[in-house]
Amino acid sequence: MPISVDGAMRSKIEAVLKGETDRKVESFLIDANREFVTDYTDVYENFLRGLINDDVPTLFHCTAGKDRAGFAAAITLIALGVSKADVINDYMKTNDFTQERIEEIISQIELMSLYQADAEILRPLLGVEQIYIETAFKTAEEQYGSLENFIRVGLNISDADIKKLRNKFLEG
């Protein structure tokens, strides 16, 4: 996903780690999920168009494979007709599959800082919280009336495109 995590985000996270701000790491991810809807519709439109039009397997990811890629997976599932509740449940399974790796990262950060850094502060950055995806969904619903309308209007994906996507990926 060509959505960069800029230096400003890194400096904000460093400020949290150093205790230079009261802002919580979670707030950065809430903001990012809102911005997927408000600022990156072109990226997600291109992503869905690739799924619709390309006849090759698709591998998509981002740094941790949960935020930018998680939203891409979520809107794909919505376009395929999966319920919002099921999409959220699927999104939350990310934590089940990454828990062991998250614990390793927390331990490495603590060790590398000689136990001077409170690596637990970063835990929300390493996993997912329901509020992250719900923020994206709520933003889409507020701006477009529904998630389906966000896909149709916000991402410029026609009913014919959605039908093609469903024919390609669904059986029956």
PLM region spans:
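Cys-dependent protein tyrosine phosphatase-like superfamily
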Residues: M1-L59, A72-G172
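Ser/Thr-glycine-rich phosphate-binding loops at phosphate-binding pockets of nucleotides
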Residues: A64, R68-A69
